[in-house]
């Protein structure tokens, strides 16, 4: 990747991890890389709103507004974003289980550290989080109402990230 595509070593390393050694998948990921910055911002605003929403009815409105914003995007972008979320939760779990060598994501969003988020992703909630994200992706693929699907997912995430 570094020689053929003329990219930086840290980006090549990240893409090599994500593609699991598959060169064709790495090229696809390289082309999608420019789309990821808004994904990071959306992810951070989503999990922050989900944290605040526990026992705070006013913060539920933030989740609904977030859902409406993401629902306004195309279905393919929504699916890519949900895949990105699965990767982020996986990275947080790896950090929580003290395997930093396997963590390849570097957040570019100011004032958000994956290390601080990691303790909220554990063995008690990760399977449910993955299931809910996968179900949401499935329903979006089947032309479900994205606003309803994402609002439901957001409320479930609020419950799941506080699960000990």
Please identify what each model-predicted range represents:
Residues 1-84, 95-106, 110-164:
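Charged, glycine-rich active-site and insertion segments that engage polyanionic ligands
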């Amino acid at each position: 990747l570094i020689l053929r595509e003329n990219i930086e070593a840290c980006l090549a390393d990240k893409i090599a991890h994500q593609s699991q050694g598959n060169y064709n998948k790495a090229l696809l990921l390289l082309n999608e890389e420019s789309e990821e910055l808004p994904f990071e911002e959306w992810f951070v605003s989503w999990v922050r709103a989900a944290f605040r929403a526990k026992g705070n009815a006013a913060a539920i409105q933030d989740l609904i507004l977030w859902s409406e914003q993401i629902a306004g995007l195309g279905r393919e972008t929504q699916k890519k974003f949900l895949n990105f979320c699965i990767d982020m939760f996986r990275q947080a779990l790896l950090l929580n289980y003290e395997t930093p060598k396997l963590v390849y994501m570097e957040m570019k969003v100011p004032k958000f550290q994956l290390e601080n988020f990691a303790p909220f992703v554990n063995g008690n909630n990760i399977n449910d989080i993955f299931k809910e994200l996968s179900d949401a992706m499935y329903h979006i693929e089947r032309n479900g109402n994205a606003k309803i699907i994402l609002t439901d997912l957001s409320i479930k995430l609020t419950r799941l990230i506080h699960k000990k």
